[in-house]
Structures are given as C-alpha cells and as structure tokens.
C-alpha cells in the first residue's frame, strides 16, 4: 500500500507523476529527451540501460516495465533477460556491454565508474555523448527506482499491465498523454 494516497488505477511511477504534475513534468521531459530523443543509441539500447539499472536497484515495477519495453522494441525477450542475468554474456555488442556496465555501476554509486571502465567503453567505440547519456540515464532511473519504492507504490493487479504500458511507451514516449489517464479507470487491465 502506498505511503500516500495515489490514484489506484495508476500503479508505479505514473501515479506519482500524476500526483504532483509540476514536479512530474520536468522528470517526464528529461526522460523523453534521453530515451526517445535523437541519439546514436537505439531506443531499445537506451531502454536496456534503464532495465539494468532498475534490476540492480531491485525495483520490480521499473525493471518489469522497461524489460517489457525492450522486448516490444526488439520483438523478442531473450536480450532483456540475458542482460539482467549477466551483462558479459548478453547478446549485445561489446560497446553496449561496456555502456551497460557503466550504467549498472552508476546505479550502485557514481564513484564506482572509473577511468578504466570509461576507457574500455571508448575503446569499444562509445562516444563521449553516449557515455554522458548512459550515466545520466542511470542516474535518472536510480531516481525513478527510489521514488517508486520509497513511496511504496502499488504493483498492477494484472501482469498484462506491463505489455500495455510498454506499448504506450513505444508509441507515445514518456510525455504525459494529452487526455490524462482517467480513461484507464474504465479498463479492467489498468495501464
């Protein structure tokens, strides 16, 4: 049960972002820029960064939401599963393994990211901007993870919620839906 009164049809982060829209808006804007804006990293790669950080922070809601989004973007579920199990053997490029490692370490603590780890990423072809955005995505999702779990937000009643949420994130991004979310009160599967 959440520590404060939130809309029951909006589990996880959406309920928090709707609770205080004036703080939710800049968080959504930053997320939209980082995960859907122009980048040399694909949307799936950026969602993988969010997944690995959320998994490392043991945030079930965020891990499940972003793994489902990766799965939808890639059309398969093996990659997100393998990344959560062991980055070093995941079916991604060496550059992506290096960036995922940076993200995972940032999620645990920024000072764990060493010059050696950054140099390895650069040797695998990572640009300064990709490294910058990786660290910022990891820091942002650490905020999300602590926000969701620190407020004890509810998990959805139905696991299919995450497939609907993934579809919304893939097709509409992270911006607030123009009509809001009241329409979700009428659905049995609450996204």
Label each residue range with its predicted role.
Residues 1-191:
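Hydrophobic alpha-helical segments
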């Amino acid at each position: 049960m959440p520590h404060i009164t939130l809309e029951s049809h909006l589990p996880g982060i959406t309920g928090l972002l709707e609770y205080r829209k004036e703080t939710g808006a800049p968080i959504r804007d930053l997320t939209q820029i980082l995960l859907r804006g122009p980048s040399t990293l694909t949307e799936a790669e950026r969602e993988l960064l969010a997944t690995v950080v959320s998994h490392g922070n043991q945030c079930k809601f965020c891990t499940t939401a972003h793994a489902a989004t990766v799965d939808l973007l890639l059309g398969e579920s093996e990659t997100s599963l393998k990344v959560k199990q062991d980055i070093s053997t995941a079916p991604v490029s060496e550059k992506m393994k290096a960036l995922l490692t940076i993200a995972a370490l940032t999620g645990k603590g920024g000072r764990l990211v060493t010059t050696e780890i950054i140099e390895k990423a650069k040797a695998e072809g990572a640009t300064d901007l990709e490294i910058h955005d990786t660290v910022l995505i990891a820091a942002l999702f650490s905020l999300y993870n602590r926000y969701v779990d620190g407020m004890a937000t509810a998990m959805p009643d139905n696991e299919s919620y995450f497939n609907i949420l993934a579809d919304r994130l893939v097709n509409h991004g992270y911006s607030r839906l123009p009509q809001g979310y009241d329409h979700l009160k009428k659905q049995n599967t609450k996204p």
